[in-house]
């Protein structure tokens, strides 16, 4: 699916019956969350709330509420096509030596396609049609959702945060939630291992005492948003990747108050800085964030994060505010995980050819549990795969549980996975525990915030060297009998 910006994407979704306009007044305070949650659980359409209570700007919700719409956002027509994207990323991440002239030509064509998708910088852009500065900057003028009864304040959820480290050649794009704490202030909740936090940390060391510029794009086109949550190789910018998905170069414009480049077609852009504050150990302004209901289905504990002061807000004429909520699965992050799972598979297989399939169950809060199907070749092989998954992509840094099974187990069928665990696992021999590893700050089950343990479960058939006992043989009916019963089944009248 090809589109130019978020508005074009919305228009095409509506024509396909994948978006519904809501003309009834609906409050951003709790009501939108309940409506979007019910719609997502029913695999319903994206929703455009045209009359948010007390606001003039419409709200777009449930945009990525089905894997199919995620695929459409990534320029595909079906979820199955996402593996092609994974193959492209795998080639870029770990290119093998070309095997012949055809491979050389194919690789050259891919490189040219990526080069042709280098971002295009504009002198003016729709996102600068309207500019709020000074006292006009007031977040209360935006229909920011208050998602759950126990949330401390309204929360910006789909903001595309744009940062740049002092020694980095390109910008980083990330999705980080932002708590509203004032007319022009939000708390930027980014984990220490994420790109935005790393950029800021580098700035605070190299340029301590100087304000750190940030831009937040709300309502960027889907390819750019999804590029920020996809394992794009370091050699490729998210803007280039978005252009590759979209089939057209990503158009950027220089922010009005910094050297950062923002998506030209973004609906709303927040520009500002994290300002120095020598009273804080970091040397920069911080505040206590939370609690908020999150993708685990619980309210998280409070913690300190940097304060982003918004100096100006720019927007398109008649802007659209893109929002979401996070809660007990399924929610949009869980749906994204299901779709991006297809992108991850070729990447993993490129590095570990023994991996046959890979699955992130949506009930596992997007990434906390993974099930791997492998072609086992030697004793201890499953353990190697576990550590490979944990270390290969940053997306799996926080995966707490990995279950590894043989090729005869359908990893997308929990009945088969549970059967493999209960019949092929000895709890002492086949579980691997690793302590003091990075864990999501939102994971309150870990003993220390941001640091906890991981478990690997080897549910494969055991080889000599792993057991001294005669291993069980699975029960299967002969093909001849199955064929015979198929032939007489209708006559049996069962």
From Swiss-Prot:
Its main location: membrane. GO terms for biological process: ubiquinone biosynthetic process. It is found in: Cell membrane. It catalyses: a 4-hydroxy-3-(all-trans-polyprenyl)benzoate + H(+) = a 2-(all-trans-polyprenyl)phenol + CO2. It comes from Janthinobacterium sp. (strain Marseille) (Minibacterium massiliensis). Its cofactor is prenylated FMN; Mn(2+). Belongs to the UbiD family. Keywords: Cell membrane, Decarboxylase, Flavoprotein, FMN, Lyase, Manganese, Membrane, Metal-binding, Ubiquinone biosynthesis. This is 3-octaprenyl-4-hydroxybenzoate carboxy-lyase. Mn(2+) binds at residues 172, 238. Prenylated FMN binds at residues 175-177, 189-191, 194-195. Homohexamer. HAMAP family: UbiD. Signal peptide: none annotated. GO terms for molecular function: 3-octaprenyl-4-hydroxybenzoate carboxy-lyase activity; metal ion binding.
């Amino acid at each position: 699916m090809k589109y130019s910006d978020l508005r074009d994407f919305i228009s095409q979704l509506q024509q396909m019956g994948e978006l519904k306009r809501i003309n009834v007044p609906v409050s951003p305070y709790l009501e939108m969350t309940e409506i979007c949650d019910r719609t997502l659980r029913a695999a319903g359409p994206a929703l455009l709330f045209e009359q948010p209570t007390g606001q003039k700007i419409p709200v777009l919700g449930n945009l990525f509420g089905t894997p199919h719409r995620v695929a459409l956002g990534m320029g595909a027509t079906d979820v199955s096509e996402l593996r092609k994207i994974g193959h492209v990323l795998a080639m870029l991440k770990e290119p093998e030596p070309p095997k012949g002239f055809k491979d050389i030509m194919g690789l050259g064509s891919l490189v040219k396609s990526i080069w042709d998708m280098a971002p295009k910088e504009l002198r003016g852009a729709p996102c600068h049609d309207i500019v709020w500065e000074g006292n006009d900057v007031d977040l209360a003028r935006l229909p920011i959702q208050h998602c759950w009864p126990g949330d401390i304040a309204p929360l910006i959820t789909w903001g595309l945060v744009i940062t740049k480290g002092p020694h980095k050649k390109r910008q980083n794009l990330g999705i980080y939630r932002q708590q509203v704490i004032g007319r022009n202030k939000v708390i930027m909740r980014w984990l220490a291992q994420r790109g935005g936090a790393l950029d800021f940390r580098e700035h605070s060391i190299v340029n301590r005492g100087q304000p750190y510029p940030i831009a937040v794009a709300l309502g960027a086109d889907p390819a750019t948003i999804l590029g920020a949550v996809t394992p794009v190789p370091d050699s490729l910018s998210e803007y280039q990747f978005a252009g590759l998905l979209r089939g057209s170069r990503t158009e950027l414009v220089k922010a009005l108050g910094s050297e950062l480049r923002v998506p030209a077609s973004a609906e709303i852009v927040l520009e500002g800085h994290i300002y120095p504050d020598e009273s804080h150990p970091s040397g920069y302004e911080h505040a206590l964030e939370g609690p908020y209901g999150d993708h685990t289905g619980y309210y998280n504990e409070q913690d300190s994060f940097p304060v982003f002061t918004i100096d100006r807000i720019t927007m398109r004429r008649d802007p659209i505010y893109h929002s979401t909520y996070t809660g007990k699965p399924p929610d949009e992050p869980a749906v994204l995980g299901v779709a991006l799972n297809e992108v991850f598979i070729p990447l993993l297989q490129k590095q570990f050819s023994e991996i046959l399939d890979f699955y992130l169950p949506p009930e596992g809060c997007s990434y906390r549990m993974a099930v791997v199907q492998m072609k086992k070749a030697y004793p201890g092989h499953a353990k190697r795969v576990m550590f490979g998954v944990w270390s290969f992509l940053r997306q799996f840094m926080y995966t707490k549980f990995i279950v590894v099974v043989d090729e005869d187990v359908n990893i997308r069928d929990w009945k088969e996975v549970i059967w493999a665990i209960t019949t092929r696992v000895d709890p002492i021999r086949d579980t691997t525990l690793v302590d003091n590893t990075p864990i999501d700050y939102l994971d309150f089950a870990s003993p220390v915030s941001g640091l906890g343990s991981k478990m690997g479960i080897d549910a494969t058939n055991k080889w000599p060297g792993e057991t001294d006992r005669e291993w069980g043989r699975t029960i299967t009916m002969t093909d001849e009998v199955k064929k015979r019963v198929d032939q007489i089944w209708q006559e049996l009248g069962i």
